[in-house]
A protein has these predicted regions:
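The beta1-alpha1 cofactor-binding region of Rossmann-like NAD(H)/NADP(H)-dependent oxidoreductases
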Residues: 57-67, 99
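Conserved glycine-rich cofactor-binding loop
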Residues: 13-14
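Active-site helix of classical SDR
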Residues: 117, 153
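Residue(s) in the substrate-gating loop at a strand-loop-helix junction
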Residues: 137
Length: 181
């Protein structure tokens, strides 16, 4: 029986999430990896196995997120670590930004993170432990031209992380704001 912590990682088709999943699988951790494109996960990491569950998930869709979290718990029995890594950048001046694109970025970078976190928290609270890693950015602290709204999403992630850490510490749940860049 595998006693290693079960990881749920969002945004795994490339970048940080992809590298993290590779390292976790190399070390034998059970991992549920999500992407909007499940096939890309299968091509990179292989088919579903005892320690790997590739899943298509749209983090902006709350009902989709809940069904994926249920699938992960059904397969592995619990979730010990959540890495909220999914997100993207939309660059434009404040004056010229397309509001539809701006809302879509907030839906993924902020509200998607909340959807996944809110779906996983009851599981972690019930088991009296867990660790949530929210990937923000140094952009939460250092803004520049063209990146105002992206940085605003990452500042929101920072604020959510700090607040959540205080709200769930009594349940044995830790929250870390990861700031790559």
């Amino acid at each position: 029986m595998n006693t290693k912590k079960v990881w749920l990682v969002t945004g795994c088709s490339k970048g940080l999430g992809n590298s993290l999943v590779k390292k976790l699988l190399e070390k034998g951790y059970p991992v549920a990896a999500t992407s909007r494109n499940k096939q890309s996960l299968i091509e990179q990491f292989g088919e579903k196995s005892d320690v790997f569950l590739p899943v298509s998930m749209n983090i902006a869709d709350e009902s989709n997120v809940k069904s994926v979290v249920d699938e992960v718990v059904k397969k592995f029995g619990h979730i010990d670590v959540l890495v909220n890594n999914a997100g993207y950048t939309y660059l434009a001046t404040i004056e010229e930004i397309n509001m539809k694109d701006a809302r879509a970025m907030f839906d993924v970078n902020v509200f998607g993170l909340l959807n996944v976190t809110r779906a996983v928290l009851p599981i972690m609270r019930k088991q009296h432990h867990g660790h949530i890693f929210n990937v923000s950015s140094l952009g939460a602290y250092n803004v520049g031209p063209l990146s105002g709204l992206y940085c605003a999403t990452k500042h929101a992630v920072k604020a959510i992380s700090e607040t959540l850490a205080r709200e769930v510490s009594e349940f044995g749940i830790h929250v870390t704001d990861v700031k790559p860049g």
